[in-house]
From Swiss-Prot:
Protein's gene: tal
EC code: 2.2.1.2
Keyword set includes Transferase: yes
Keyword Cytoplasm included in the entry's annotation: yes
Chief location bin: cytoplasm
GO BP annotations, alphabetical order: carbohydrate metabolic process; pentose-phosphate shunt
UniProt organism field: Leifsonia xyli subsp. xyli (strain CTCB07)
GO molecular function per UniProt: transaldolase activity
Catalytic site: 147
Reactions this protein catalyses: D-sedoheptulose 7-phosphate + D-glyceraldehyde 3-phosphate = D-erythrose 4-phosphate + beta-D-fructose 6-phosphate
Name by which UniProt lists this protein: Transaldolase
Amino acid sequence: MTDASSTAVSPTAALSAAGVRIWLDDLSRERIASGGLQRLIAEKNVVGVTTNPTIFAAALAQGAAYDEQVRGLAATGVSVEDAIFEITTDDVADASDIFHDVYTATGGVDGRVSIEVEPGLAHDAAATIAEAKRLAAKVDRPNVLIKIPATVEGLEAITETIAAGISVNVTLIFSLERYRGVIDAYLTGLEKAKAAGIDLSGIQSVASFFVSRVDTEIDKRLTAIGTGEALALKSKAGIANARLAYKVYEEAFAGDRAKALVAAGANEQRPLWASTGVKDPSLPDTLYVTELVAPNTVNTMPEKTLDATFDHAQLAGDTVTGEYAGAQGVLDALAALGVDYDDVTATLEREGVDKFIVSWGELVETVRKALTDAQDSEAAQ
């Protein structure tokens, strides 16, 4: 008799089979050096990594994994900004090497590692384009994705970065209208790349739609309204918004413009569900995983959410494509209560950029202190 436990498919394997690719929303040198990434690939179906300034600030503030490189950088007298550039691109290059087999096995679709442009450039298209090219050249791996925020200025940067043949992870998307602009920016970039004779098949992109932050902001407003009708809508907006984003994706890539590019070798820009860690302890800890299962998507998870998904996620097939009417009903009900969708998403975009700028500042101070300490230690010897 076969042991049922030995043949059971894990929830993460089932999620992958349903068309949802699992990426880890975390990276550190300790995780790279310890074999932790390889274990997640082998055991929990992880096929990519996303990073951001908050993640790097936390990684550098903990442990001694960066000490040797910091000492070397301190000895050369580099600026804090250049030290950050060296440290973060080294981590991303090493992680990209670890995921190279996944990249090869999936024909370049997965095995992707993301690194974000400096968030202070979010409203400067030209500087973002230059930084995206600099990051891509420094990491110099075919499976790197450059993260560019979906600000108005970011849309131009997305187009020009894609046009240069560089793969892009578009981050901080909250509104459906901005998402349409992101898709247009991607397609325009592909058209320019095609005109320049660039092989479109090597260009990948994901559009990172943030989920739990939408609930956090809207639930705050619903609590302030305080009626039974308002409270009944709590924790529903984020999923509804993401489901309608998938509808936008389906419609856009069923259109003649996208189909012509795909026929020329281009890849669809996949929706990526970001901010999928549950903030409200009263909610199921896999809510933003199980309720957003749809083909050709990515879910990037903090490790806590990944572990919960692997341990006990209850999957029920596609939970997106048959839910568009209900999702629209949620947004309509919010509007009827006076919750201003455009104000919510504009607030979230502004706060998202600001939070990453704060994290970047923390990263700068952490590296500045590490460089100073290393220089002082060397001088004392």
